[in-house]
Amino acid sequence: MLELKEKLTEFARQNEIQIELLDQIDSTNNRAAQKCYGAGDVIIAETQSAGRGQRGNSWSSLPGQNLTFSVVLQPDFLLAERQFRISKTAALAVADTIADTGLTPSIKWPNDIYIGNRKVTGILIENDLSGAYLCRSVIGIGLNVNQTDFDPTLPNPTSLSREAGHTFDRAEIFIRFYQHLANRYRMLAEEEISDKNASQIDTDYLNRLYRLNEEHTFIDGRTGEHFTGTITGILPGGDLEVRIANTGQLRTFLFKEIEYVI
């Protein structure tokens, strides 16, 4: 934690934000919900006893090896029906950060980050609404940085260190992420306020999308049946669009209605 504290305390001062560094907590997202944090503030914990991922999964991480944190945003310019764009923004910020290391990340819908067929980052986003607009978003991120040994029951974990063959400075990785998030978030706000038809965020997300235009085996989360299909795109609300191989039918799936077979 010391190497994080020294660099991130100065980074927080320069950017006029609060970065709270904790040894242990139940969940950084939970803490963000319980205390009053401003836009751009961050909670980082070495250990989370109840770290959460998508689909209700837990997120485990060895102390001192990775980055587990939450960032608070106030996207009051974003309509609730377009909230999936926050997921795109966060996923792209992580992907941009990993790409800076020379590795090649992809985004597994909706917002897991993969290197090859292995998961390096999980993202959990929790939004609050005020009328038709978002008023607050908490972006929870678990980024595997230097951990190389994982629980054997986990299906396909990896880390930056395992993929690159060397360790990384966690503070530098976090600072790069925060800078990329600020850039992507600024891009999101500009696109929403100007109501641009062409979206760089949407284009970049598709370009990073795991298994896009590739035939793949999936599980229908509603029936448990395996099927083969090809991801063709993402609808504005975030639904995954898949062309079914044996019928040619184009179907859309909500989160938890489809699983990848990896």
Task: Place the predicted regions along the sequence by residue.
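N-terminal lobe of the biotin/lipoate ligase/transferase fold
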Residues: M1-D100, K119-T121, F168
